[in-house]
UniProtKB/Swiss-Prot annotation:
GO terms for cellular component: chloroplast; mitochondrial small ribosomal subunit. Disulfide bonds: none annotated. It is found in: Plastid, Chloroplast. Keywords: Chloroplast, Plastid, Repeat, Ribonucleoprotein, Ribosomal protein. It holds the Pfam family Ribosomal_S2. InterPro entries: NA-bd_OB-fold, Ribosomal_uS2, Ribosomal_uS2_bac/mit/plastid, Ribosomal_uS2_flav_dom_sf, TRAM_dom. The keyword Repeat applies. Residues 38-97, 127-186, 197-260 form the TRAM domain. This is Small ribosomal subunit protein uS2cz. It comes from the Eukaryota. Residues 1-271 are annotated as: N-terminal extension. Belongs to the universal ribosomal protein uS2 family.
Amino acid sequence: METLEKNFKKEKSVFSAAKKKKNLSFAKNEKTTTLKDALQAGDILTVKITALGSKNIGVAELKNGYTVLVPNTKCGDKVQVKVEKIFLGKGTNSILNQKIKYVVARVDNSGTKTSNFEKTSNSLKFDFKVGQKFRVTIAKKGPKNSGLVPVAKNFLFIVPNTKVGENIVVEIQKIKQNYAFAKPILSKQMNVVQENNQMIGQQFHIVIPSSAKTIANSFVVKLNGQFVFVKKSLGVQLEDTVKIQIQKSTGTFALAKILKISPISSKEKKAMVKETVQKMIQSSMHFGEKAIRCNANMRKYIWYRKKGLGMYTNSKNTFVSIKETKKPMVKRGRHVLNVLKTQRCFAEALKQLAKYAAKGKTFLFVGTKKPAASLVAKTALLSNTSFFVNTRWLGGMLTNWKTILKSISQIRPILKQKQKILQKILEKREKIQRRLFNKVYLLRKKSQKFMIKGKYLIQQILRSKNFLIEKSQKFIQTKNALFSANALLLNASKNLKMKKIQILKQIQQLEFAAVEILKQKQPIKSFNSIKS
């Protein structure tokens, strides 16, 4: 057995070394290849079958890098074949860094009466085929956690992922000259039992169809070829998405219970957590208290960064850490909190609050910082059974409530007076607002009128280009007419003034004449009086 294993290892090492040399030589001479090295359909070759693949197809390798596939052959035979198809594969050779070349050929039976098969001394004496099944016992441990099964003096089965002493059924996958690769297979019954055991405890997200039947207080649903009896619970109805867990399973049916109604998938949960964490970071929730005021019990919720002192080894250039120290991350003089842990704590707190809310308990919301004050008030006002403190926490609000009630009774009259003053101020403000609104309304009306006039002028300008010129000429004519009328009026006023002056002169002359007449009358009167 030891000699077989040694021979197998030697053959493997020799084959790999020869293959590397061949590939390297081909890589060196690749630039100097001629048209003779390139194969064509119809070429006749003599190849040696080194392995058998699926469907008993022989595999041979050529020096120019081609892999020849020949059906209906045996491992170890030299065969004369005729090339039928040549194509390049999708894979690449890691040594040559080029595409793998494949050749499909068939055994050439034309032209010669002699046999095309030449059996060598190393040809396979046993008639094994790919796909055959055998029950074997693992005799010895092989390389890479594989098991070795000796079939004859010069032939082995290599079975991966097996242990020494296991009695299993194997199926041949590939045949080489002195060994074959096989994989372990299980019987159908073992597979069914294993599948049933694997099904128990598994969870599935399903939609209960509208056509689902109900038998003995449970829905009947078909899942992966099995009939699953889902117990009715949590108020489930038809066409609901539910999360179920398999409790019992057989080959044809299974029993399951409902865990959740309309569950959230893991991807959606991750997306929701990601969104919440981003919002927390955007609202600066990752900044804690000052580093000096840190409480020792809260250190587990701080974000730490690792600093390691290391060295590189000379042998494999690997980094080996000698000392690792944890230091808290500090920004702006404050500790950076682990937001993931805070999110988990929020989720746990939410569960507890939901339980208390379902029982009808009352809550007190406290948030005295300015950024949180408005949010605390809004959240507290959403429920009728909640109270909040968002300005300043008074000492003894929970422990000494009686004294606080007394101080509240003293403050109430002051608050009433304050409310009256505020009402007066608000009334004055309302009056001022009304006046301002009225003024704004009037200004809007005036502006609308100006807009209408402006639109009318623009329309007239667009209709006639000479509109302004004509209008200006009319204005000039009217202006000239006014000037001429003014001149006439001035002349008339001058004439009137002259006439007035003349009339005044005449009046003065008449007055002077009247005075003289009166002077003449006085001696006449005196004379008459003397006569009488």
